[in-house]
Design a protein with these regions (language model features):
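Active-site C-terminal subdomain of aminotransferase-like
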Residues: 1-64
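Conserved C-terminal alpha-helix-loop-beta "cap" of PLP-dependent enzymes
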Residues: 53-139, 143
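Basic, glycine-rich
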Residues: 144-149
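Catalytic-site microenvironment of enzymes
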Residues: 150-155
Length: 155
């Protein structure tokens, strides 16, 4: 790391001390064999599908029955694209929370969720909005349920 800090490319690329600290922590995690637990992207990529499904069901259970019905919410098996680095086209099995009862309601829900705080991004397929629960951290389950409840309340 000290050689990297002194390298002329460091100045040319404007690598700041926070970036170097993050890189150093990541490399230490790999060296210690803890990267799968401590690097969020790796943890998401290697999480068992059963855990992802369970988290999707937890989000669904956090929705009030009337909200669930209004959204047409349910859990479905899906696939996600890793989409970068050495695996740009690799598909990964996942579980998604799917909402929307028609093309119009799906578009309104998508817009409401994207414009929310925090923004929630999904993808639309077959007139339904799919929210990949592999990318939802356990601590975000309540936030996602709240965002869906707010989106369902919008006209």
């Amino acid at each position: 790391m000290s050689r990297l800090k002194k390298n002329p490319w460091n100045r040319a690329l404007r690598i700041d001390k926070f970036t170097i600290a993050a890189l150093e922590a990541t490399l230490h995690a790999y060296e210690a064999g803890t990267a799968l637990q401590t690097v969020p992207t790796l943890a998401m990529l290697t999480e068992p599908l059963t855990s992802v499904r369970a988290r999707a069901r937890r989000v669904l259970r956090r929705l009030a029955p009337d909200v669930r019905e209004r959204l047409g919410a349910r859990v479905v098996d899906d696939h996600g694209m890793v989409g970068g680095g050495a695996l740009p086209t690799v598909e990964l099995p996942t579980a998604a929370l799917t909402v929307g009862t028609s093309s119009d309601t799906t578009m309104r829900l998508d817009e409401a969720l994207r414009g929310g705080d925090p923004p929630v991004l999904g993808r639309i397929a077959h007139d339904r909005l799919l929210l990949d629960c592999r990318t939802v951290l356990a601590a975000q389950v309540g936030l996602l349920a709240e965002a869906l409840t707010r989106a369902a309340a919008r006209p």
